[in-house]
Design a protein with these regions (language model features):
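Cytosolic, low-complexity regulatory segments enriched in Ser/Pro/Gly with interspersed Lys/Arg
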Residues: 1-21
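Acidic, metal-coordinating catalytic segment for phosphate/diphosphate chemistry
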Residues: 19-72, 80
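Active-site-adjacent beta-strand/loop module that shapes the phosphate/pyrophosphate-binding cleft
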Residues: 42, 72, 135-160
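Conserved Nudix-box catalytic region and its N-terminal flanking loop in Nudix hydrolases
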Residues: 51-127
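Short secondary-structure junctions
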Residues: 125-135
Length: 160
């Protein structure tokens, strides 16, 4: 069902890939990943590609932010790559992204964001999943926010 839904979404939004022209190829490919659409209480209502979730008026979807602290209590912040499509070159938290509409990340909200965080910590910071899977993540709550980058790109997320 997911594959049919993705193919239908691509046909219905055939002009969206044009919005990615001129962007880094690997970043553009990640924009095809399926985010988890949620209602205002973080209840799952469907899935949609990252590009559709972040383009135009945006669509509310589940996300996460990881705050990493060292033994002295200092938080790691990172400057987002200038190749990022949304919010390039901006200073941000240690790691942020989205759980995807895949079995390991789309069932339980908290466990899903932990699995997604481990995946992205490896991809973005090079911290192996074999290391992060042993960590104890502390879920400190959720909040909803909207933040526009420019006329085209926006965030609208329930962030864990």
């Amino acid at each position: 069902m997911q594959e049919f839904s993705r193919q239908f979404d691509r046909m219905a939004n055939a002009d969206l890939p044009d919005k990615l022209e001129g962007h880094d190829q690997s970043q553009a490919e990640m924009m095809d990943e399926q985010c988890i659409l949620v209602g205002s209480n973080d209840q799952v209502i469907g899935s949609m590609s990252k590009v559709e979730c972040h383009f135009g008026q945006g669509n509310r979807h589940r996300a996460f932010s990881v705050l990493l602290f060292d033994s002295s209590g200092r938080m790691l912040v990172q400057k987002r790559s200038t190749e990022k499509i949304t919010f390039p070159g901006v200073w941000a938290n240690s790691c942020c992204s989205h759980p995807l509409d895949i079995p390991s990340e789309n069932s339980d909200p908290i466990q899903g964001v932990v699995k997604a965080a481990c995946r992205k910590l490896e991809q973005e910071l090079g911290i192996a999943i074999s290391v992060t899977s042993k960590w104890q993540f502390n879920h400190i709550g959720t909040f909803e926010y909207r933040c526009r980058w420019n006329d085209s790109w926006i965030e609208h997320e329930i962030d864990h």
